[in-house]
């Protein structure tokens, strides 16, 4: 899909075809709970600020919440503009466009996009925001997929076998690698912190999408219990 100079909102399927860096403008705690894999978090509000603005929306009015949001954001404008420029330089070369999303594709992403456009950055918004992305993720698990499971006792080198058979016709999903957990015997000893179940699902969904785009014929993965540590297998 060619990237036109536009500030329109895109459905998930079209948004993912674009190549610009992805910016998640939600609060840090929202981002940690789950995000589009590869997205960069540039929060418009901190967790505390978001709570306060949400409270004014519920107890006072939408207009009051907007005023409070502007009052919070305006002093940070210079810092946000610098972060926007840094984000456009993360990939090789200079990207003059950004993909942006918030929770529902509302005022946070639109306000951030406006800031980016003031310094000549083209913006592409995700229609429906992260909420629509999560719907896309969960839909990936509803499909009838040609899954093959590898079973065996601990230490029988099942992961090595998966790595060996991985080729263009067979798509391998390393559940233990994604979950940062080696199963019941070794757990997460010596591994990085586990992702949330939500983020675990997001990463698997992206892998399933690669299965389709690469025209593979089978999906191979290691047979696991319903959970890998704190990650629940969808």
Predicted regions: what is each one?
Residues 99, 121-134, 174-179:
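A short glycine-rich beta-strand->turn/loop micro-motif centered on a GG-aromatic cluster
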Residues 167-234:
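Conserved nucleotide-sensing/catalytic segment adjacent to the nucleotide-binding pocket
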């Amino acid at each position: 899909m060619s990237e036109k100079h536009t500030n329109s909102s895109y459905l998930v399927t079209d948004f993912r075809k674009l190549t610009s860096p992805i910016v998640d403008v939600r609060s840090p705690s929202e981002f940690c709970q789950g995000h589009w894999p590869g997205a960069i978090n540039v929060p418009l509000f901190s967790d505390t600020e978001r709570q306060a603005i949400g409270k004014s929306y519920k107890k006072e009015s939408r207009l009051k919440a907007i005023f409070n949001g502007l009052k919070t954001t305006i002093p940070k404008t210079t810092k946000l503009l610098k972060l926007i420029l840094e984000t456009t330089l993360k990939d090789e070369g200079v990207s003059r466009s950004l993909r942006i999303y918030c929770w529902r594709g509302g005022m946070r992403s639109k306000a951030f996009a406006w800031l980016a456009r003031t310094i000549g950055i083209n913006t592409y918004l995700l229609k429906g925001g992260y909420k629509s992305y999560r719907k896309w993720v969960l839909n990936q698990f509803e499909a009838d997929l040609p899954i093959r499971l590898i079973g065996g006792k601990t230490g029988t080198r099942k992961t090595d076998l998966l790595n060996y058979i991985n080729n263009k016709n067979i798509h391998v999903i390393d559940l233990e690698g994604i979950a940062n957990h080696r199963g019941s015997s070794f757990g997460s000893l010596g591994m990085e912190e586990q992702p949330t179940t939500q983020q675990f699902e997001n990463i698997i969904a992206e892998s399933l999408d690669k299965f389709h785009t690469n025209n593979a014929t089978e999906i191979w993965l290691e047979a696991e219990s319903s959970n890998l540590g704190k990650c629940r297998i969808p």
